[in-house]
């Protein structure tokens, strides 16, 4: 029987290759959600994912869902929407509101993995410059957005939401264009699903993903990309 690794006060994680196959990708439990631990985890392709009644669980799935920016799919109808929409898009204007909205979204599984502890941890990570948000506005009303972590020249997407049709897709479109400005090559989507696949997300063997991540982490992202502002249409 394989025993699950328990984290201690150090920032040490076991190698992702030691993750379980059942449940797939579960690597360790315990530890905390400090800024240093979160950044250390993401730099190694590891992320927390757990429910309110569970200990902190750490994952590194195989295969990994990634979105190569050159593979991002924009349908004709979405392009038309982007050209004509009155919706505005901003970066890092309302991170707190975005993560709270994502936590309220009803998922296929019961409950939410964005617990109060997770919310507080990622808000602190945002304040330290390690997590960022894209917001979509209808006049002054927040109608969509997404957030994620940047452990290097890669964006690790965490969650998205929308109250208006195509609002989350609009946020993704602007995110992709923003990342391209910094020479970023892919978004870490963690796990593949039908919605992400429709946008161009593919599955990649974990070992290959970790090699690409290792290179991306060597090159910090230009923080000027994340200055709070309204984004103009590319």
From Swiss-Prot:
It catalyses: N-terminal L-lysyl-[protein] + L-leucyl-tRNA(Leu) = N-terminal L-leucyl-L-lysyl-[protein] + tRNA(Leu) + H(+); N-terminal L-arginyl-[protein] + L-leucyl-tRNA(Leu) = N-terminal L-leucyl-L-arginyl-[protein] + tRNA(Leu) + H(+); L-phenylalanyl-tRNA(Phe) + an N-terminal L-alpha-aminoacyl-[protein] = an N-terminal L-phenylalanyl-L-alpha-aminoacyl-[protein] + tRNA(Phe). One of its GO terms (biological process) is protein catabolic process. Its main location: cytoplasm. Its EC number is 2.3.2.6. It is found in: Cytoplasm. Signal peptide: none annotated. Pfam families: Leu_Phe_trans (PF03588). One of its GO terms (cellular component) is cytoplasm. One of its GO terms (molecular function) is leucyl-tRNA--protein transferase activity. InterPro entries: Acyl_CoA_acyltransferase, Leu/Phe-tRNA_Trfase, Leu/Phe-tRNA_Trfase_C, Leu/Phe-tRNA_Trfase_N. Keywords: Acyltransferase, Cytoplasm, Transferase. Functions in the N-end rule pathway of protein degradation where it conjugates Leu, Phe and, less efficiently, Met from aminoacyl-tRNAs to the N-termini of proteins containing an N-terminal arginine or lysine. Belongs to the L/F-transferase family. PANTHER family: LEUCYL/PHENYLALANYL-TRNA--PROTEIN TRANSFERASE, LEUCYL_PHENYLALANYL-TRNA--PROTEIN TRANSFERASE. This is Leucyl/phenylalanyl-tRNA--protein transferase. It comes from Pseudoalteromonas atlantica (strain T6c / ATCC BAA-1087). The gene is aat.
């Amino acid at each position: 029987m394989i025993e699950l690794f328990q984290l201690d006060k150090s920032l040490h994680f076991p190698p992702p290759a030691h993750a379980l196959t059942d449940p797939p990708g579960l690597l360790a439990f315990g530890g905390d959600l400090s800024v240093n631990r979160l950044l250390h985890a993401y730099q190694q392709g590891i992320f927390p994912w757990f429910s309110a009644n569970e200990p902190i669980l750490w994952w590194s799935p195989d295969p990994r869902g990634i979105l190569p920016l050159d593979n991002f799919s924009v349908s004709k109808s979405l392009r038309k929407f982007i050209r004509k929409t009155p919706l505005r898009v901003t970066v890092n204007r309302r991170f707190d509101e975005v993560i709270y909205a994502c936590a309220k979204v009803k998922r296929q599984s019961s409950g939410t993995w964005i617990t109060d502890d997770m919310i507080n941890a990622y808000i602190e990570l945002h304040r330290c410059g390690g997590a960022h948000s894209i917001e979509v506005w209808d006049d002054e009303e927040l109608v969509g957005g997404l957030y994620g972590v940047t452990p290097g020249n890669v964006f690790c997407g965490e969650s998205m939401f929308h109250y208006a049709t195509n609002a989350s897709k609009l946020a993704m479109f602007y995110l992709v264009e923003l990342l391209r400005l910094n020479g970023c090559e892919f978004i870490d989507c963690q796990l593949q699903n039908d919605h992400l696949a429709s946008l161009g997300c593919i599955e990649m063997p974990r070992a290959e993903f970790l090699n690409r991540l290792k290179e991306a982490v060597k090159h910090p992202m230009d923080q000027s990309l994340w200055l709070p502002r309204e984004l103009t249409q590319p």
